[in-house]
Curated annotation (Swiss-Prot):
An example molecular function term from Gene Ontology annotations: ferrous iron binding
Entry binding sites for Fe cation 2: 68, 113, 147
Name this polypeptide is given: Ferritin heavy chain
Gene this chain is encoded by: FTH1
Residues reported in the UniProt entry to bind Fe cation 1: 33, 68, 71
């Protein structure tokens, strides 16, 4: 086998009704999901620091990081099942290393989830425009409802932290960490 044969992707024999634009959009979504995982991992590490010490914030964001990575892996599996090719891109560094407060991190997470949701809605529209019912069903089944739930949960967390006086009232984040995140399913 020549070097050229090893480096060029052969055409898929399973590909059917899978537009190149959809394939490219899936690769972009994979990158976005991995970026979200990376951001949540950064948040988790911040809250696990000895000078921050909010262990349930750390656990919550670590769980979110794992979920986002699983989303990326699911999309990779879909890409292979549909006969597409996975082209991984560099994952952008999170915008910050210091998340300042639980409230700030939750607000950033809410913004991130809304961005991911918007990207999924655009992917769904593309699949609709390309008459790809398989991709539409996949996005509806595995992503859209979960995104709405995540956005609602994060919105509730932001509201409750604000009501408690965070971040000015330091005790608010400690109590939220202990009583809300300490008893959540995440």
């Amino acid at each position: 086998m020549t070097t050229t044969a090893l480096t060029t992707a052969s055409p898929s024999q399973v590909r059917q009704n899978y537009h190149q634009d959809s394939e490219a959009a899936i690769n972009r979504q994979i990158n976005l999901e991995l970026y979200a995982s990376y951001v949540y991992l950064s948040m988790s590490c911040y809250f696990d620091r000895d000078d921050v010490a909010l262990k349930n914030f750390a656990k919550y964001f670590l769980h979110q990081s794992h979920e986002e990575r699983e989303h990326a892996e699911k999309l990779m599996k879909l890409q292979n099942q549909r006969g597409g090719r996975i082209f991984l891109q560099d994952i952008k560094k999170p915008d910050r290393d210091d998340w300042e407060s639980g409230l700030n991190a939750m607000e950033c997470a809410l913004h991130l989830e809304k961005s991911v949701n918007q990207s999924l809605l655009e992917l769904h529209k593309l699949a609709t425009d390309k008459n790809d019912p398989h991709l539409c069903d996949f996005i509806e089944t595995h992503y859209l409802n979960e995104q709405v739930k995540s956005i609602k949960e994060l919105g509730d967390h932001v509201t409750n932290l604000r009501k408690m006086g965070a971040p000015e009232a330091g005790m608010a984040e400690y109590l939220f960490d202990k009583h809300t995140l300490g008893h959540s399913e995440s």
